Amino acid sequence: EICLSLWPFIRELPRNIALVRDSLPENMEAGKKLLGQLADDELTYQTMYAKQCVLAGITPDQLKFDVLSEPTQMLCQAMRRWCESPNYRDGVLAVVTAELAATAYARNTLEIFEKYFSDHADEYSKEEIEDGLEWLRLHSRPHTRHAIWMRRMLDDIEVAPGDSLPVPAEQVLNALYRLWKCPIEDNKPLLEGAL
């Protein structure tokens, strides 16, 4: 269900990231490099994610039609809003939030998926499993260069550590919480800003 619910967001992500990349000032070289790679002009990450969906039992025909549940709509709208903002800082915060959330999700679920498909290896080909888990594996690995570029990009927009999340980050994160069906009681203070 999560695979299919995230698909519309994943499909829009290259466009959203490219909008932010193209709005950055010339002096934000690290940000341009990072967003240039994340924009996925060749749709490599998107193809990996589609293979993950197929491994989860979703047909390619199902991927042609968006499943726009309320949480999916909220996530797509939040990401679009901040990536299309005239203030590139908003888009940077939205993209960084989405990227860090993808990393956290992959690191927390990869082992579970690997165990499941290992236990059911007789039901899938080795290639299906490898291809289907590639997106999770990629996002669970550390990417030092990306981390350095991300830190420099955040320094360039002068994001200081603090007690509260910037609004774009909070709204994208809250939309993800809803989509992932995180317990509302645990996230109530964060969810208030997304309603």
Per-region residue spans from a language model:
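Non-heme di-metal
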Residues: 1-195
